[in-house]
């Protein structure tokens, strides 16, 4: 079930659900999602659903990957994006094909090691990885034109706001319950603009790296 037809069916569904950025949809189409899940689940790779990847984590629903990526790129191309939560590496791979450089932070080293292997297999070389606490971001390489967070924070981390460049965009799910709110935050001349968008379901953004 990893045929081109199943991929096309997924893209058609995303388009019908309101996603319209042709560049994002094309990258979703050509990115082999089945490589980012366990072989036992590969037959479900092109369903529009989140799937388990171990360590109580999931690979995000393709709609949400596309939605968050569209929001990040809505103001134009970006050259420097930080991703909080490498996970399987699928969102990382999508970003790597759309922006100049991706800086990806993951607290679970085993997940990040697998993600590195997958991106190398796809010859995506514009990603730098850090094993660490996503709440802290990666201040040594800040600022970033875009930040995308793939787990739900109970509140917007101040450290991530501090690492956003002027005009930069932060896409993040916020909330402590089972259902959270997807937010778009833009750094302006006099502070930050905040927009609440969709109700979403993400695993929580936790503190502290795990070897």
UniProtKB/Swiss-Prot annotation:
<dbReference type="Pfam" id="PF01135">
    <property type="entry name" value="PCMT"/>
</dbReference>
<keyword id="KW-0949">S-adenosyl-L-methionine</keyword>
<comment type="function">
    <text>Catalyzes the methyl esterification of L-isoaspartyl residues in peptides and proteins that result from spontaneous decomposition of normal L-aspartyl and L-asparaginyl residues. It plays a role in the repair and/or degradation of damaged proteins.</text>
</comment>
<dbReference type="GO" id="GO:0004719">
    <property type="term" value="F:protein-L-isoaspartate (D-aspartate) O-methyltransferase activity"/>
</dbReference>
<comment type="similarity">
    <text>Belongs to the methyltransferase superfamily. L-isoaspartyl/D-aspartyl protein methyltransferase family.</text>
</comment>
<dbReference type="GO" id="GO:0005737">
    <property type="term" value="C:cytoplasm"/>
</dbReference>
<dbReference type="GO" id="GO:0032259">
    <property type="term" value="P:methylation"/>
</dbReference>
<dbReference type="InterPro" id="IPR000682">
    <property type="entry name" value="PCMT"/>
</dbReference>
<keyword id="KW-0963">Cytoplasm</keyword>
<keyword id="KW-0808">Transferase</keyword>
<dbReference type="GO" id="GO:0030091">
    <property type="term" value="P:protein repair"/>
</dbReference>
<keyword id="KW-0489">Methyltransferase</keyword>
<feature type="active site">
    <location>
        <position position="60"/>
    </location>
</feature>
<dbReference type="GO" id="GO:0036211">
    <property type="term" value="P:protein modification process"/>
</dbReference>
<protein>
    <recommendedName>
        <fullName>Protein-L-isoaspartate O-methyltransferase</fullName>
        <ecNumber>2.1.1.77</ecNumber>
    </recommendedName>
</protein>
<comment type="subunit">
    <text>Monomer.</text>
</comment>
<dbReference type="InterPro" id="IPR029063">
    <property type="entry name" value="SAM-dependent_MTases_sf"/>
</dbReference>
């Amino acid at each position: 079930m990893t045929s081109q037809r199943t991929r096309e069916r997924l893209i058609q569904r995303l388009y019908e659900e309101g996603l319209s950025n042709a560049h994002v949809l094309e990258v979703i189409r050509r990115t082999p999602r089945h490589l980012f899940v366990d072989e036992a689940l590969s037959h479900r790779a092109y369903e529009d659903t989140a799937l388990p990847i171990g360590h109580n984590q999931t690979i995000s629903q393709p709609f949400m990957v596309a939605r968050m990526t569209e929001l990040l790129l809505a103001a134009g191309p970006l050259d420097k994006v930080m991703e909080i939560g490498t996970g399987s590496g699928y969102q990382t791979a999508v970003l790597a094909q759309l922006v100049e450089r991706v800086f990806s932070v993951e607290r679970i080293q085993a997940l990040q090691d697998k993600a590195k292997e997958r991106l190398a297999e796809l010859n995506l070389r514009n990603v730098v990885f850090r094993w660490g606490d996503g709440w802290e971001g990666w201040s040594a390489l800040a600022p970033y034109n875009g930040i995308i967070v793939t787990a739900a924070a109970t509140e917007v981390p101040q450290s991530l706001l501090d690492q956003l460049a002027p005009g930069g965009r932060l896409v993040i799910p916020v909330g402590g319950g089972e259902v959270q709110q997807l937010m778009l935050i833009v750094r302006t001349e006099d502070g930050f603009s905040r927009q609440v968008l969709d109700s979403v379901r993400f695993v929580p953004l936790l503190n502290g790296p795990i070897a």
